[in-house]
Amino acid sequence: MTENNEHLALWGGRFTSGPSPELARLSKSTQFDWRLADDDIAGSRAHARALGRAGLLTADELQRMEDALDTLQRHVDDGSFAPIEDDEDEATALERGLIDIAGDELGGKLRAGRSRNDQIACLIRMWLRRHSRVIAGLLLDLVNALIEQSEKAGRTVMPGRTHMQHAQPVLLAHQLMAHAWPLIRDVQRLIDWDKRINASPYGSGALAGNTLGLDPEAVARELGFSRVTDNSIDGTAARDLVAEFAFVAAMTGVDISRLSEEIIIWNTQEFAFVKLDDGYSTGSSIMPQKKNPDIAELARGKSGRLIGDLTGLLATLKGLPTAYARDLQEDKEAVFDQVDTLEVLLPAFTGMVRTMHFDGDRLEEEAPTGFALATDIAEWLVKNGVPFRHAHELSGACVKLAEGRGQELWDLTDNDFIETFAAFLPADKAPGVREVLSSHGSVDSRNGKGGTAYGRVREQIADAKAEVEELKLFPASTSDGSAYKAPGTF
């Protein structure tokens, strides 16, 4: 393709000179917005057809325009066309490319009836809708990996913790599923967000709409949107939906980071709950023995990056008056970075989760330690008629007695229980507390909805699988149920 290197600007006329070199360098955005080129060309096709329907392009002109756009798309795809130094943004570059193919007279007609304001507002929506589906699919892969590990864990019991201290025994599967549900909600958030962003700003113009008789609804349909934005000012200026996506991305990072923190702790020599596959671990340049959980550490670190992208975007938006301002150029890098981060992070993280191996014997050994069955003693006492306030004190007395001897609760003698419970239970009944002094007994007793009993965990795994089956339709569909296709293929 022959490049037209003559400077092309999308504005001028009232200016006596072009932009200063300093302004040109500051304004330049092709280094990050070129990734919108495919969406821009798809939007240009739809806009050209709208111009044709409005009688602003003849049938012959429309055909030549579409042919030129197809040629431009091929040149973008094969890399023979790319931005040059003088191109301010991807829209400027693509108009230059179109004029180079179609000629100045025909190529110059495409800009009629649209502004970069409504154009870029639409492109970022198209791009985010597409990539939200990619991210949703990757998140569901991670959820499935957690479900697989939960099924594999079976009845294995581990120490549940609050404040990082031993609290109560729980099934390993229950602990893992506690991380699956937030990730499911992240996908649900993307689906809910898509309902709001599923509106095309095309036709809003700079801010007041267009006067050329164009059909925004037809353009919206061609670009995969179910409707047109209700207010042209809002259509060009609103970035709350971009910020909402940024929040979902940041929340996803936080959810992954919390799981990462547990994996990092579980993987230490002191805990030794889990071993990571060699393919998802790294070594040390100086210490031959090291096997490091780098994926979990990188995930934990990148969550801060995702939060920073959201915070920066919100700070940019907070002081803007309504209608377009150039500050809004700053919306794109934040979400581009988030998408790039998640689309690289999630496959690696899923691989780590899917291949990690838990030491069931170690988990079972640790599950009842640290007086983790103290609550079970208190609840047993309640079932035997002791008010909970007193039951709590009596259980605490058992802990104090065992702790003073360097023992665990199950090491206490029958006489210890008889003496401790003497004010509330007859001597022949007190030793019956031993029936709850096992981690499996503790787990099995917690059989309410959402509890850690084996049957309830199997129930929630089945519920999660059903939810995933429903949610996995989103990565392949638009919110109105039609197939979601690549730009330009609607």
From Swiss-Prot:
<dbReference type="InterPro" id="IPR020557">
    <property type="entry name" value="Fumarate_lyase_CS"/>
</dbReference>
<comment type="pathway">
    <text>Amino-acid biosynthesis; L-arginine biosynthesis; L-arginine from L-ornithine and carbamoyl phosphate: step 3/3.</text>
</comment>
<dbReference type="GO" id="GO:0004056">
    <property type="term" value="F:argininosuccinate lyase activity"/>
</dbReference>
<dbReference type="InterPro" id="IPR008948">
    <property type="entry name" value="L-Aspartase-like"/>
</dbReference>
<dbReference type="InterPro" id="IPR009049">
    <property type="entry name" value="Argininosuccinate_lyase"/>
</dbReference>
<dbReference type="GO" id="GO:0042450">
    <property type="term" value="P:arginine biosynthetic process via ornithine"/>
</dbReference>
<keyword id="KW-0055">Arginine biosynthesis</keyword>
<protein>
    <recommendedName>
        <fullName>Argininosuccinate lyase</fullName>
        <ecNumber>4.3.2.1</ecNumber>
    </recommendedName>
</protein>
<dbReference type="Pfam" id="PF14698">
    <property type="entry name" value="ASL_C2"/>
</dbReference>
<dbReference type="Pfam" id="PF00206">
    <property type="entry name" value="Lyase_1"/>
</dbReference>
<dbReference type="InterPro" id="IPR029419">
    <property type="entry name" value="Arg_succ_lyase_C"/>
</dbReference>
<keyword id="KW-0963">Cytoplasm</keyword>
<keyword id="KW-0028">Amino-acid biosynthesis</keyword>
<comment type="similarity">
    <text>Belongs to the lyase 1 family. Argininosuccinate lyase subfamily.</text>
</comment>
<dbReference type="GO" id="GO:0005829">
    <property type="term" value="C:cytosol"/>
</dbReference>
<dbReference type="InterPro" id="IPR000362">
    <property type="entry name" value="Fumarate_lyase_fam"/>
</dbReference>
<dbReference type="GO" id="GO:0006526">
    <property type="term" value="P:L-arginine biosynthetic process"/>
</dbReference>
<keyword id="KW-0456">Lyase</keyword>
<dbReference type="InterPro" id="IPR024083">
    <property type="entry name" value="Fumarase/histidase_N"/>
</dbReference>
<dbReference type="InterPro" id="IPR022761">
    <property type="entry name" value="Fumarate_lyase_N"/>
</dbReference>
